[in-house]
Amino acid sequence: MTVRVAINGFGRIGRNVVRALYESGRRAEITVVAINELADAAGMAHLLKYDTSHGRFAWEVRQERDQLFVGDDAIRVLHERSLQSLPWRELGVDVVLDCTGVYGSREHGEAHIAAGAKKVLFSHPGSNDLDTTVVYGVNQDQLRAEHRIVSNASCTTNCIIPVIKLLDDAYGIESGTVTTIHSAMHDQQVIDAYHPDLRRTRAASQSIIPVDTKLAAGITRFFPQFNDRFEAIAVRVPTINVTAIDLSVTVKKPVKANEVNLLLQKAAQGAFHGIVDYAELPLVSVDFNHDPHSAIVDGTQTRVSGAHLIKTLVWCDNEWGFANRMLDTTLAMATVAFR
């Protein structure tokens, strides 16, 4: 069965989902039947074809009236502001990938369902009343047919949750802190300009900028036992893609740095293959651009202090890795719903 997908919002994640679908060779499993985006179709086609972070798209892209063509595949283009007015029933949509970054409540998900979609997957953390939140590689096996409105969490949650799970299962985590070192995003300014967050009034290319993060809440959503025992801070840095996460945890069992690395390396080669990778080369952030893994552990940066404090550095392509997980979760949702 081929899953019929519609994409709502054709920004960074929406476009990368389409690129990842074609580059990963999964068109027999997923077909994009429609994209809803308020921008004009010519601009959509141009930004799909030419991307500053990921280069030229290898597939031919063209726009004709209300259709976007990728190769010979026609995708209907919509410019609808009202979720309730979207023609999902007419188009036979199985799963809507809502990549707007704006919608994320149960009410928004129900609007897609009312318009005719069978399932909805949000590309960012949703409200607590969604059916479930998935970090693929960790809990997708808990998906059920009755789960209609789902969140794919965030890029940073997908990056750090697998590593936390591995360390907790092996050594027993007592508490932890996380620092996200995230590339600049669209909600920052090119030059100094007004923003409700005064730090984000400043030019993104000129400063390391602290921002608020809900990553600690995302961690405790998956690990309730860590409530009040994990904290997170975040800074934005003047790069356009790839993120690093500095993770520090105190653990119950004594451990050495080489043992931590061996654990994570074996996981990357085994149970978490394709989700977690492990590297010991002297690499920098740009080397992880277009990497499809959720997390790449930098073994050169692992430290252990006093046998119980572990520090690790984990990389991710916050666009490309997450877009690939959107596809994985879509297939997982369809498998349990339509088998």
Curated annotation (Swiss-Prot):
Tell me the superkingdom of the source.
Bacteria
List its EC numbers: 1.2.1.72
Q: Catalytic residues per the record?
A: C155 (nucleophile)
Pathway given for this chain reads:
Cofactor biosynthesis; pyridoxine 5'-phosphate biosynthesis; pyridoxine 5'-phosphate from D-erythrose 4-phosphate: step 1/5
Tell me the InterPro entries matching this sequence.
Answer: E4P_DH_bac, GlycerAld/Erythrose_P_DH, GlycerAld_3-P_DH_AS, GlycerAld_3-P_DH_cat, GlycerAld_3-P_DH_NAD(P)-bd, NAD(P)-bd_dom_sf
Which family, according to the similarity comment?
Answer: Belongs to the glyceraldehyde-3-phosphate dehydrogenase family. Epd subfamily.
What is its biological role? Catalyzes the NAD-dependent conversion of D-erythrose 4-phosphate to 4-phosphoerythronate.
| Protein name as catalogued | D-erythrose-4-phosphate dehydrogenase
Protein source organism:
Escherichia coli O1:K1 / APEC
Q: Which gene encodes it?
A: epd
